[in-house]
Design a protein with these regions (language model features):
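Active-site hotspot residues in diverse enzymes, especially metal/ion-binding acidic/histidine motifs
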Residues: 1-326
């Protein structure tokens, strides 16, 4: 485990994704178990078994030279390797563990307004559960990983087994912000930015990035969630006043009030004040639960292999039952 830690996978991660369910501290002194653990480590880090067995040789996460890093500040590509690797491994486990037959892949339209029109929902406002339900129905999983190597990233979209997977890794629980990040990552798919072997990795949405791909993805996400018209601007300065006006805009224009506030925060750079305003709207919690519930409706943990269940233990939340996908 020390070599895995040196490779960027700390003890708590190694304990979840490598060691079997029945493992306890007493097993560490049983040499007969070593071959199985070596095999598990080799499979996880994608390394030759001979290298894993050479105790004097260092282990490392695979290189991902094709990964496209966006909105990254002061982090070298190599340091994100372990987090990218774990995200891909968990994404693969989710695809393999789908409840029933994999649905046909239907990528959302390149026109964000058309996707918004097609998306089933119970009100004029597009919210996180609407985005999640539509993506899973299209055969595109969304997973939120809690146990991640550091440094990590906010969101990644990758192609696994021929279909996109959206991977979230920061500890956000704000539904509107998570919906924006998810739609942003989907934009990288519909615009052709994300290809097999070339995941798009966004470290943090508040980090500036003038790349055309990021501008397109931001605009796509805004249009999906808010519609074709520009998000009405807020002019208030006090967080409670911001929240009140944003709530009025939601009622008038059908745009999530928290999204209105976050748009103001991005325009002004007042992200801390925007967070206070979203809190005043009681909009800071519930995102993790919504993502977990959508996951549980579509993934069969009971039917998953032991190694896939281990990888999927890294996700936020506990299994909430086995409802049939709707």
């Amino acid at each position: 485990m020390r070599r895995l830690a040196a490779a960027g996978f700390k003890r708590e991660i190694a304990r979840e994704v490598v060691l079997p369910d029945w493992w306890d501290d007493s097993c560490a002194s049983d040499p007969s178990l070593l071959p199985e653990i070596e095999l598990r480590v080799a499979r996880f880090v994608d390394a030759p078994l001979s290298l894993v067995r050479a105790a004097d040789q260092p282990l490392s996460a695979p290189d991902y030279p094709g990964a496209q890093l966006r909105r990254v500040r002061d982090i070298h590509r190599d340091r994100l390797g372990p987090a990218i690797h774990l995200g891909l491994r968990v994404a693969e486990a989710a695809i393999r563990s789908w409840r029933g037959a994999l649905p046909s892949l239907r990528v959302p339209p390149a026109d964000p307004n058309l996707w918004r029109e097609e998306m089933p929902r119970s009100s004029t406002v597009v919210r996180l559960p609407d985005v999640l339900a539509d993506l899973w129905a299209r055969g595109i999983p969304v997973i939120h990983i809690a146990l991640m190597p550091s440094p990590s990233y906010q969101g990644m979209v990758c192609i696994v087994e021929g279909r996109p997977v959206v991977v979230l890794a920061h500890d956000f629980d704000e539904p509107a912000r998570l919906a924006f990040v998810i739609a942003h990552e989907v934009a990288h798919v519909v615009h052709g930015d994300c290809e097999p072997g070339h995941p798009v990795v966004d470290e943090e949405d508040i980090n500036p990035d003038d790349h055309d791909a990021e501008k397109r993805a931001d605009m796509y996400s805004v249009r999906v969630l808010a519609g074709a018209a520009p998000i009405p601007r807020l002019e208030e300065a006090d967080p409670k006043a911001l929240a009140r006006r944003a709530d009025e805009i939601e009622q008038e224009h059908g745009v999530d009030a928290a999204l209105v506030v976050r748009s103001w925060g991005k325009r002004t750079g007042e992200h801390a004040k925007a967070t206070l305003a979203v809190a005043a709207l009681y909009g800071m919690k519930g995102g993790k639960r919504a993502i977990r519930e959508a996951f549980d409706r579509h993934i069969d943990l009971d039917g998953a292999t032991e190694t896939d269940r281990a990888l999927l233990r890294c996700l936020h939340g506990e299994p909430q039952g086995h409802a049939t996908p709707g």
